Structure formats: C-alpha cells, structure tokens
Amino acid sequence: MKTRNYLELSQYMIKLLKAAYKKCSKQKVDVKDKGSSDLVTSLDLSLEKFITTALKKDFPETKIVSEEFNSKIEAKGTYFVLDPLDGTINFANGLNSLYGLQIAYIENDVTVASAIYFPSSDSSYTAAKNFGAFENGKKYVVTPKPVSHSLLNINTTRADFDTMYKLLEELKYKFLRFRIIGADCYDFVSASLGNFGGLVMRNGNSWDILPGLFLAEQAECKITTYKDYIIVSNTEEAQSAILKAFRKIIKQQKECKSAK
C-alpha cells in the first residue's frame, strides 16, 4: 500500500486502530501476570495480532516493533512501532477512560507519523511531519497556562519512586496539583493539549514513548531529555522549573553516593 504523504499515513493508522478495537473488544477478556508489577490481557494480544496482520499485508517490506509479539526486533531504521493497549493495568482495573491504542511510523530513525485512539470517548489523535498535530481531525497546538494554574503529571515505576517523590517535594509550591495517571498515551496527549503544565517520565520502550512524544512535538510542546527522563511542558516557565528541580535532585544523589 502506498500513501501520498505522512498525513495520509497517520489517517490510515488511526483507522486501523479503530477497526482493531471494534473487532477485538467484543471478546471475553482474560488477565494474566506479565513479569514484576505488570499485567497482560487477551485484548492486548488480539489487538496486536489484528493490527500487525493488517500492517504486514499493506506494508509487507516494513518491519514491526510491538510490545507483545515483536519486542525483540531492533528499533532501528524504518519500522512501525505499536502498543496495542497502552495502560493495560488501568484497563484491567476498570479505569475505562485511562487506556488507549497507539502506533507510530519511524523512517530512517526519525518518527514521522503517529496515531493514538481512546475507545472510551472515541477520540482520535494523529500527528504527521510537516502537517502538525490533530484532535479528531482538527489541527491544534498546545495551550499555555501559568505554572501556578497547572497540573504536573509524573509517570513513575517502583524503581523511580524515590526520585519522583523528591521532584514533587521540590515543585509542590510551583504547580497547582500533581497527578499520576499510568498510561503513556494519556499522559502525552494531555500534555500536548496543555491539560498538564508539565509531564515527567523515564525514557522507556519505543512503543510506550514514540507515538505520544511525536504528537507532543508536533503540538509545539517544550520537550527536553535530561539524563534518562523526558520532560514535556506547555511553557518555558514550566520547563525551566522542572529542569531546575531535577538538576538539584541529581546533584544531591551524586553527592550522597560520593559520601558513601
């Protein structure tokens, strides 16, 4: 299958995500453990199978990196990256608005198109190089807000908890309130809209990060990678405050290690 441009490709991808959910969500869902502090459901698996089958048919020469069946494939060059159900733990625990399907297309190691779909609200978010970010087909850019009126969202794991807790301590009088959502797709979309003044998460698997990060880039968010973390903000003021706090925490951690 050929697409004329990245915008058309992003539209193809969102249609595919919608079709996959419509087909697969009718099945009974089983939940299983997936390593330490993680879950996988039968819906994850059936969605991934549906989407990858379609991609292989329409783009037979393009490799696919995906969470459940193709996670060992090297994320390099030109490829699709897919998270069939991002926010699985939220989904498995009945948090029905806090999960989504996401995909991105990477060309020569550069993300050029992505799509995110939220079934609970039937909401679509797409991004395409040279075209921008779109909510349900309508182009948008991030909405700035004063830091004092903004939410700071962190996406954390057990391994990051101490660092993130210290970050919240540093910023508790800067931002209005804090949130922990636990779904990369939701986090990035909310940050791209300006619903979060700041978002902090560890740079992780390509299927978790690339679709939403590209959306935030195309929505003209402020984005910085610091150490192993990604910081997304709706203003320079918010970005500066988060970076300043992070640098202080990292410096203190280094000093503690040296003292030992």
Kindly give the residue locations of the regions a language model identified.
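A structural micro-motif at secondary-structure boundaries
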Residues: E135-V141
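Residue-level signal for inorganic ion chemistry
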Residues: L17, Y21-C24, D44, L55, ...
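N-terminal subdomain of lithium-sensitive/metallo-dependent phosphomonoesterases centered on the IMPase/IPPase/PAP
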Residues: M1-L85, S258-K260
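DPxDG-like acidic metal-binding loop motif
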Residues: A75-F134
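An extended, acidic
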Residues: P144-K260
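Generic detector of well-ordered alpha-helical packing
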Residues: L45, E68, P84-G87, P119, ...
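A short, compositionally biased
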Residues: K26, Y99, A127-F131, E217, ...
